[in-house]
From Swiss-Prot:
Transmembrane intervals: none
Valine amide PTM sites in chain numbering: V12
Subcellular localization: Secreted
Swiss-Prot/TrEMBL GO biological process terms: neuropeptide signaling pathway
Protein name per the record: Periviscerokinin-2.1
Main location: secreted
Entry annotated with the keyword Secreted: yes
Function field: Mediates visceral muscle contractile activity (myotropic activity).
Family: Belongs to the periviscerokinin family.
Keyword Iron-sulfur on entry: no
Keywords: Amidation, Neuropeptide, Secreted
Length: 12
């Protein structure tokens, strides 16, 4: 799970 700019990635 990490965020970069306006894109967020859930821990899946």
């Amino acid at each position: 799970g990490g965020s970069s700019g306006l894109i967020s990635m859930p821990r899946v």
